[in-house]
Amino acid sequence: QYDIIWVDWNNGTDYIQKNAYVLEEVIKWINAEKLANGSSQSNVVLGASMGGLIARYALKDMEDRGIPTQTSLYISHDAPHQGANFPIGYQYMSRHALHQYVKSPALLLGGEVIMPLFTDGVTPLDLLLLQNTPAARQMLINYVGINYGITNTAHDTWQNELRIKGYPSMRKIAISNGNHCAITQNASAGASLLSIDGNYSTGWFTDIVLTTFPGVNTGIFKSLA
């Protein structure tokens, strides 16, 4: 008999270290609860995707600081220990979509005011800005910024810290969602994966708003940078 404890984050896209510190507090609480209830059962910590990085960092940080983890097994489920790859072309497409979205008052009105009423408050802008979050910048091997430039400083800094930190000492198991038979996807480097040719405009309404309020786009992009 055992208990399953699921850990969720108020801000799952925050810095990986911050959520690792939260996990440390959870592990300490679990160990205190076990002690209070006379249990000596060791913990098994499983982290999926980015959660695998959070768990690795938390367990090793506790060991480094001499805090007992009471953990016998760490399971890394498809975690990007060497970094995450999101095709640069898709990132550029996402950035272009963001630029077009904020230039369209009609879309902004529908997406940021009306749509959240039916999507638990989530807006298209929230999704288009996921690339900007601290965790995304830390994990992405190549990160395309708001102005289309590639900057990997956050990733390089994080990977160096993670490499120096190393792995916790308990038994470790890694699970990957990749193909176990090493069969490739027949996509060569630089190949075109998606191509779209077309255009769209909100026409006169956008022209009126941008003419009346010429600084609206500048203000939006300053707030996103």
Q: In which residue ranges do the predicted regions lie?
A:
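Short, surface-exposed "cap/lid" segments of acyl-processing enzymes
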Residues: Q1-W6
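Short glycine/serine/threonine-enriched helix-capping/active-site loop
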Residues: V7, H77, I175
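Catalytic nucleophile-loop/oxyanion-hole region of alpha/beta-hydrolase
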Residues: W9-E25
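Serine-dependent carboxylesterase/thioesterase catalytic core
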Residues: A20-Y148, A154-Q159, H180-L224
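Extended ligand-binding clefts on enzyme/binding-domain cores
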Residues: R163-I175, H180-N186
